[in-house]
């Protein structure tokens, strides 16, 4: 999962990157910046998923918005907030207390707050389904791009993502980093 990407959730192997990549069927994309703050937006219609996304970049936060999420598939559609090597504890705010997440935490509520490696994440909205987890993962960069050596790498990984469900219709999200 790459942060900010809305895609199908699958445990299947990643496709090997070839010379040809399916292109976005929509050409709407743009942004503006004063060098410190900025706004960008794009519409995506690619690989069976449609979504409109925008980002507002400020001095100390990024507001991420998505709307019109839809797909026709039997796979769950997710949007990743974060996936990185674990550096310290992943914490969730519950009833005013920061609690450590040691495995997987899943909740459906109007607001969730997380903290990892000096970065805070806030999700909110109507019944947002959010998953946060710390898990040991193994893989080979060679499986993604064959220019890398075929050796396995193992690491503790922090993942935070929103679940939009199977075959979502007009779903949306909003989160702050």
Regions found by a protein language model. Name each.
Residues 89-91, 123-125, 131-134:
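Short helix/loop capping segments that flank catalytic or ligand/cofactor-binding pockets
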Residues 105, 110, 117-128, 141:
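Long, contiguous C-terminal modules that act as interaction/assembly or targeting platforms
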Residues 130-177:
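Beta-strand-rich recognition/accessory modules
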Residues 1-105, 110, 119:
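Catalytic and substrate-binding regions of extracellular carbohydrate-active enzymes
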């Amino acid at each position: 999962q790459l942060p900010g990407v809305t895609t199908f959730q699958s445990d299947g192997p990643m496709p090997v990157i070839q010379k040809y990549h399916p292109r976005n069927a929509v050409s709407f994309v743009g942004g503006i910046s004063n060098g410190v703050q900025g706004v960008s937006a794009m519409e995506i219609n690619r690989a069976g998923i449609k979504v409109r996304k925008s980002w507002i970049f400020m001095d100390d936060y990024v507001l991420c918005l998505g709307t019109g999420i839809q797909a026709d598939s039997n796979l769950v559609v997710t949007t990743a907030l974060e996936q990185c090597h674990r550096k310290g504890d992943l914490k969730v705010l519950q009833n005013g207390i920061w609690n450590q997440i040691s495995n997987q935490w899943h909740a459906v509520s109007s607001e969730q707050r997380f903290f990892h490696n000096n970065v805070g994440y806030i999700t909110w909205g109507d019944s947002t389904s959010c998953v946060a987890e710390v898990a040991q993962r193994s893989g080979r960069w060679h499986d993604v791009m064959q220019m890398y050596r075929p050796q396995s790498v193992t690491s503790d990984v922090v993942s935070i993502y929103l679940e939009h469900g199977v075959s979502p219709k007009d779903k949306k999200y909003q989160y702050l980093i």
